[in-house]
């Protein structure tokens, strides 16, 4: 009972054409209501494809009864070099807006999606964006963040991708350009409200453990229902 992926496009609030895929669960009944899981890809320079994926098994994720939404947000590959570079200087805000807009359109066009039960999650850059959603919206009932940064500044100082961070964020951290100030999720900690599962590998050198610990500390300090899972590798 493997449903096909349903493709759709929309024009974002910034005038960009955004590609998406929707997947229904096994035993799908269009007369019923299903929770929506917004699955966020990492990278950001990669893309969701209509194919079998070993790392992310679409049908396995949908099996508990979720409708899955996959959005190729700004910065995704496969749509030309210019499209991939739109995330430079705007690493989180626009991509986050596009994820929310995609969910709005999926809910509008498919009556079987329960708008009151939305979840979002991802790993690596997908975790970064899940954390940005924590900072900017309360629409999701829960969030899942694997190896996601919560603090641009400490991520710059401990990750192995310092140069790439500077390109995306408009310069080194000490110059304190607008991205460092305005698109750093931890600066919005007072607004955090959404229950969250935080996971990370203890030996992750791309998004080191410290960022997950910072996030966990904020969630606990804010008394937000949350769990931290650290893998020993």
Language model: regions and residue ranges:
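Non-catalytic accessory segments flanking enzyme active sites
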Residues: 1-32, 49, 56-58, 63, ...
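Exposed loop/turn and edge beta-strand positions of beta-sandwich/beta-sheet ligand-binding modules
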Residues: 4-6, 16, 34, 114, ...
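Active-site-proximal cap/loop segments of hydrolase catalytic domains
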Residues: 62-63, 70-233
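Short substrate-entry loop that stabilizes the transition state in hydrolases
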Residues: 28-34, 39-80, 152
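Short hydrophobic segments within beta-strands
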Residues: 23, 39-40, 121, 199
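Short strand->helix junction
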Residues: 27, 45-47, 89, 205-206
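Generic low-complexity segments that are intrinsically disordered, proline-rich and/or Lys/Arg-biased
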Residues: 26-27, 36, 45, 143, ...
């Amino acid at each position: 009972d493997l449903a096909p992926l349903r493709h759709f496009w929309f024009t974002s609030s910034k005038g960009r054409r955004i590609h998406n895929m929707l997947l229904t669960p096994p035993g799908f009944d269009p007369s019923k209501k299903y929770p929506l899981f917004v699955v966020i890809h990492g990278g950001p320079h990669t893309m969701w494809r209509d194919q079998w994926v070993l790392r992310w098994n679409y049908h396995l994720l949908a099996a508990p009864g979720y409708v899955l939404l996959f959005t190729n947000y700004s910065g995704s590959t496969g749509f030309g070099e210019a499209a991939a570079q739109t995330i430079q200087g705007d690493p989180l805000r626009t991509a986050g807006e596009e994820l929310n807009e995609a969910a709005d359109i999926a809910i509008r066009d498919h009556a079987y999606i329960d708008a009151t039960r939305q979840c979002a999650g991802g790993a690596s850059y997908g975790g970064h964006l899940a954390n940005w959603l924590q900072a900017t919206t309360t629409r999701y009932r829960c969030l899942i963040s694997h190896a996601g940064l919560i603090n641009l500044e400490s991520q710059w100082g401990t990750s192995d991708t310092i140069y790439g961070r500077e390109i995306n964020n408009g310069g080194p951290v000490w110059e304190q350009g607008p991205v460092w100030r305005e698109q750093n999720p931890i600066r919005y900690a007072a607004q955090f409200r959404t229950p969250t599962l935080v996971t990370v590998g203890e030996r992750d050198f791309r998004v080191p453990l410290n960022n997950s610990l910072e996030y966990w500390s904020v969630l606990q300090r804010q008394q937000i229902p949350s769990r931290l899972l650290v893998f020993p590798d």
